[in-house]
Amino acid sequence: MSEQNSTEMTFQIQRIYTKDISFEAPNAPQVFQKDWQPEVKLDLDTASTQLAEGVYEVVLRVTVTAALGEETAFLCEVQQGGIFSIDGIEGTQMAHCLGAYCPNILFPYARECITSLVSRGTFPQLNLAPVNFDALFMNYLQQQAGEGAEQHQDA
């Protein structure tokens, strides 16, 4: 039997937590008097850190900005963290796990937190659509491959 078959991939969620929260409504209360037709912008970012052998922290940063014309109605940022035990994978598989699989787990928690903050700011309910982190990760890999090819051509 080969060594590859004897090593199983293990994955466990140790903890999911809110690392940082920020909510700003810089133009309140005047913004409440305006017709509510906001332009909503969503920004996502992930970061991962190895804490110990086989233990990783993944942080998903979600920033939502709602603007009415040139005025910011609200700005909400949540950093949702998770500690995961991951063994038996490496390389691109590990990068996919940390950059797509773990953020997929964290996003519903961040989304709920943002929805709650926006509601507490007395703005209309904000329902963020699910995010396909697998597609975002594949785009990232393609972008990195393209940049690597450009650097290779320049040499």
Swiss-Prot record:
GO BP: protein folding; protein tetramerization; protein transport
Keywords annotated in UniProt: Chaperone, Cytoplasm, Protein transport, Translocation, Transport
Subcellular localization(s) per the UniProt record: Cytoplasm
GO molecular function (one): unfolded protein binding
Signal peptide interval: none
Any one Gene Ontology cellular component term annotated for this protein: cytoplasm
Keyword Chaperone: yes
Major place of residence: cytoplasm
Keyword Membrane: no
Superkingdom, taxonomy of origin: Bacteria
Cross-referenced NCBIfam families: PRK05751.1-1, PRK05751.1-4, secB
Family: Belongs to the SecB family.
Subunit text: Homotetramer, a dimer of dimers. One homotetramer interacts with 1 SecA dimer.
Summary of the function given for this chain in its UniProt record: One of the proteins required for the normal export of preproteins out of the cell cytoplasm. It is a molecular chaperone that binds to a subset of precursor proteins, maintaining them in a translocation-competent state. It also specifically binds to its receptor SecA.
PANTHER family registered for this protein in UniProt: PROTEIN-EXPORT PROTEIN SECB, PTHR36918
Protein name: Protein-export protein SecB
